[in-house]
């Protein structure tokens, strides 16, 4: 009887595990002045080991499991002859048998306007070293930089924190990020989990370099263990943004 119960639990746990996630997104920018902009994107993450969902919020399962991974994304828009492309790859590595964390990413932003000389290319990069002093808590220091083709370049120190914990009978996710120097960028975010499958949240983002200042609200719902949908609305000084994404885990 005991062995049969353990076998059933093992099968149940394996059924809720996943090792990859792929997603598709659509974003719409509605500026106060000028034409609207639409972008489509795809993204993917592969985990080195299967991620067990256990009793955690499904959106935080990989983080709480300290699941090392590689990830990639690409976004593309062609609006009235203005082509915008962003793509990048990254890695997160939780050092085995320790509480240390490493991450890095590199990306490329390209913008091209038909019948003009506008053809900008910017390479971006970032790296972090982090520590997890308690379950669900990550503290990280790093560097974030950019290099424009035939233009400026720079790199600035960064600090980041993420904390997933319980408040009463519900889970919450709290995040903060800052980059100091030429970038002068910071971001805060909070998510409240109504249950393990549904969250609502808010965020604020400010970047002096790009003159971006935006407050956003978001929601995410897992329709089952594999399929999720999410949306966000952002309210900026000069524009509003709308985004949706659907993803599948396997």
Residue map of PLM features:
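Mid-chain, structured segments of secreted extracytoplasmic proteins
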Residues: 54-88
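Flexible, solvent-exposed loop segments that connect beta-strands
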Residues: 76-82, 104-123, 145-155, 173, ...
